Amino acid sequence: CIAAGAVKLDGKTLGDIFLGKVTTWNDAAIVALNPGVKLPDSKITVVHRSDGSGTSFNFTNYLSKVNPDWKSKVGEGTAVQWPTGIGGKGNEGVAAYVKQIKGGIGYVELSYALQNKMAYTAMKNAAGKFVQPSDETFAAAANSADWGSSKDFYLVMTNAAGDNAWPITATNFILVQKKPKNPAGLKNTLEFFRWVYSKGDAQAKALDYVPLPDTLVSQIEAYWAKTLPR
């Protein structure tokens, strides 16, 4: 059994695994990234989502940025035509299959991996460093991202440039109407998220989510004041 984070992958190799081009754990491409690690001569079984999901969008967006073959043959989306593997419904379905199948590999939110005591790989990021998924590497991705109000702060954070950034970090977005039919409802919603941003860090971290950087929160609240009805 190899400990969590002991195996290293880069984006191209990860993409080749999900393309079905790298099919064993001791393939030369994986061995080259893991000198000194005894890798098993066992088949890799890819597990992906069977349902459409933001998790799949984020994962396939990342692969499209780092693996040209993936970009040209599969691309990105909440649901894609997977070249190989089996599908599981939801994060829980993917986690269950990966746990059951020897040599399985999939993608889930970190909270599911931790709750299910699953191993995970280290990944080579855009800065060329191998990093593991954690609050610190997620925060590094968020802190290095180029947020901006011109696109309502919409940003896909995959392959972020930060020195210690986890390369497959995702953001959750809240959508509200700029001209709501129920202004009181919008006001209550914004008050809730003001509380989340100012008081909710501990709850977010307990669920393995990372709070937004303070500077970004200030920008968002200024944007609310300028853009949304009071």
Model-derived regions, located:
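Flexible loop/hinge segments at secondary-structure junctions
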Residues: 1-230
